[in-house]
Design a protein with these regions (language model features):
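Mid-bilayer segments of alpha-helical transmembrane spans in multi-pass integral membrane proteins
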Residues: 98, 102, 123, 127-135
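Internal alpha-helical transmembrane segments of multi-pass membrane proteins
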Residues: 110-126
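Conserved small/polar residues in nucleotide/adenosyl-binding loops
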Residues: 149-156
């Protein structure tokens, strides 16, 4: 049976909704922003594995917009960032970091090993985005005395689940 575009669109919307609900289940809220959530990246990765990278990136981008809106309600604008740093934070910490989850399907035709490898690459790319954002933000505050090791530890915790 040939899959319709409408069915794929609805499935993507359901996965974004499920990922959003899971992102509200916070196991631990980190002191400098971010949190450990209950498998909130999994629905986006599953969609990307099932439908491919192109559609996965599209759904992941929609999820990034939802996460940005959630970040606004969590107090993103209360951080006291300069306008340039705020724009950098929005693009790196939200749009790029969540959109890269769509690459989880890059090895989808390789079976379970490919699914795991693609998901691990997606999570690593998300970590890189958050790490770069942390460097940019803390450098703008003049607080780069915070070591890169400490920053890596913070971002690693934020990307665990």
């Amino acid at each position: 049976m040939k899959r319709s575009k409408t069915l794929t669109l609805v499935e993507g919307a359901v996965m974004v909704a499920l990922a959003t609900v899971l992102s509200f289940i916070r196991i631990y809220k980190l002191p400098w922003g971010g949190s450990i959530t209950l498998l909130s990246m999994l629905p986006i990765a599953v969609f990307s594995i099932k439908h491919g990278v192109a559609k996965g990136l599209g759904v992941a981008f929609v999820f990034s917009l939802v996460q940005f809106i959630q970040g606004i309600t969590d107090g993103l604008f209360g951080w006291g960032l300069s306008p340039v740093m705020l724009v950098a934070c929005i693009f790196i910490d939200y749009l790029a970091a969540y959109t890269v989850l769509g690459v989880a399907g890059m090895f989808r035709k390789k079976g379970a090993v490919g699914w795991i490898a693609g998901t691990m690459i997606a999570v690593f790319l998300r970590f890189v985005c958050h790490f770069l954002s942390g460097v940019v933000i803390w450098k703008s505050f003049g607080a780069l005395s915070v070591s890169y090791t400490h920053l890596r530890a913070h971002e690693t915790l934020a990307n665990l689940v």
